[in-house]
Amino acid sequence: MNSTATSPLRAGVIGAGVFGGYHAGKYVENPDTTLTAIFDPDQARAQALADKHGVTAYSEVGLFLEAVDVVTIASPGVTHAEMGARALRAGKPVLIEKPLAVTGEEADQLVRLAAEHQVALACGHQERLVFDVMGLTGIQTPPRRITAWREGPWSGRSTDISVTFDLMVHDLDLALTLIGQADAETLSVEGKTERSDSLDEGSMSARFSNGAELELKASRIADDRRRGMVVEYEAGVIEIDFVARTFKNTTGFDLNPDYMDTPEGRDPLGANVARFVEAVLGRATGPAAPGEAGAAAVRFAERIDAAAGQ
């Protein structure tokens, strides 16, 4: 990884939609970055976001890449591999919103390109940082079982990808982080399509080679917003409701129930951008969610969609 960069870094955002706007704002707030450029094929949208922050909108991605030191890619998921590859080949450290890509082959190519060009590749799995401040990622024993659900009403966003890649991929990453180096030996999947051309609601269950069991549900066509996780260990159970903000722990593990009072809990996106920037500047050993982790989540999501007949 190249750590010869100096602060402030010139930051650019590819994708001027909702999440592109969020990332642009985080670069404006970060003392180690200066937001410099916006690229979006929709020139009017790119110009609107650029005007909001007083920066330049580009209509050609090559010129955009010449104007920046680091890149966030927050364009539609199906474009992540192409845009990521262009930025990495230009020698730019890249933070790609989830999913890292939409196929395992694409994701692995991005990881290879980052290694080849010795630049940081990060993924937008910022909830890892929340688990860090909770203390969950510090537990050395893998859980016996994880159950998680992530549901919300239809928003009309991210219809280019399935709910597996849109929402469930977050919990896949978190679950793989806790379960560790183990393979999913069994997998069953159910899902339905209502509002898009891919899965809008899905559930999966898997058993891993270390005995851990995983059950996930994700929906973007639910009546209400629900998000929670139950992690079962031999020592007890951890129950988290991220909407109601409740936290129960019967395990005896030293965890932080006040995680929402931490900077990471209040602003996980900002914390993830900051960690990415610190990695580029050589102040951190790597991003919170490196490309390899994003690729692992993509490969699992791809397997789930294949099992659902997608």
Which residues does each predicted region cover?
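C-terminal helix-rich "cap/oligomerization" subdomain common to oxidoreductases
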Residues: M1-T4, L63, V70-I73, S209, ...
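Beta-loop-alpha module in the N-terminal Rossmann-like domain of NAD(P)-dependent dehydrogenases
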Residues: H23, D42, H53-V111
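Hydrophobic residues in well-ordered beta-strands that form the structural core
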Residues: S59, I96, L121-C123, I240
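A contiguous active-site-proximal alpha/beta segment in oxidoreductase catalytic domains
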Residues: A101-S158
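Rossmann-like dinucleotide-binding domain that binds NAD(P)(H)
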Residues: S155-D224, E292
